[in-house]
Amino acid sequence: MKKSIILSLLFVFTCQFFTHAQWLEKKGNGYFKLSAWSLEADQHYTNSGKIDPNATRGVFNLNLYGKYGLSDNWNVIAYIPFFVKSYQNHQVSSVTNETLLEGEAFNSFGDMDLGIEYRLFKKSKHAFSTILTLGIPSGDSKGGSDGSYQTGDGEFNQQLRFNAGTSFSLFKHSFYGKSYVGFNNKTKNFSDEVKAGLEVGTSFVGGKLLLLARSNMVRSLKNGSLNASNNNGSIFANNVEFISIGGEVAWKFTKKLGLSLGYHSAISGKVIYAAPSYEAGIFYLLK
């Protein structure tokens, strides 16, 4: 099971990939972000939804995200984790302080996501679009001495999503809302998935400060034959199911440059780490 739960938080990686999904960039404009993402856990959700302990494991990720307007109706999107570290800490006796089991780490390139987005409809405050995303197995699905330190899941997947976005006022203050629903067709005996999410945000200080809250959900169709059992937690497993909540704060210190901080955590799940993830990044707006 060690090998299959080290594969499940891939979905958490791709949540950030779609942060700006409902707002297409105009022709020649773009949004680019360099981020560091981290998660460390000593417990995980089992395949029955209970929480069990595991050796402390973690994943650290450096990635580039980009979205560029080919036209006002077509955008290209890329998520490139150019450095992924999968590791396990030393196991130390609480009585003698002796190292019982040496830790291990494995570094490599991660799985990329490449997508194209098309505007279906836009009128007044409402916008609708669709995204086709290809999950490229550019990471290592058998990393480390026992093959459990993966930086990718080894399978090529195709995800189709429908997005809806709107703006509204509350207490005379402007907000935006986003939602999506999608289907992820997975290969190599992984189960297909249904995904959905919501996001609400607003800005302050003349648009320099952005605050947002989001929730994401994934449900497995359980139509794959790959074993989902795991006793050690994971970020790329089969039959992952969870509901996560989180938020992000971003500050634009110039018209084109800014910093962001993010936090996300699963509040329920199956075959996934039971611990929060943290992200920090710097972004550039091409206008």
What are the functions of these language-model segments?
Residues 36, 68, 80, 118-120, ...:
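Residue-level signature of outer-membrane beta-barrel architecture
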Residues 88-185, 191, 232, 237:
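Outer-membrane pore/translocation modules
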Residues 30, 60-64, 110-114, 156-162, ...:
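Hydrophobic, lipid-facing positions within transmembrane beta-strands of outer-membrane proteins
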Residues 73-78, 124-128, 170-175, 207-211, ...:
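Repeated loop/turn-to-beta-strand initiation elements of outer-membrane beta-barrel proteins
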Residues 38-61:
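Surface-exposed strand-loop-strand hairpins of Gram-negative outer-membrane beta-barrel proteins
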Residues 201-287:
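Outer membrane beta-barrel transmembrane domains
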Residues 42-50, 88-95, 140-148, 188-194, ...:
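Outer-membrane beta-barrel translocator domains and adjoining extracellular loop/strand segments
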Residues 30, 34-38, 78-82, 130-136, ...:
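Transmembrane beta-barrel strands of outer-membrane/channel proteins
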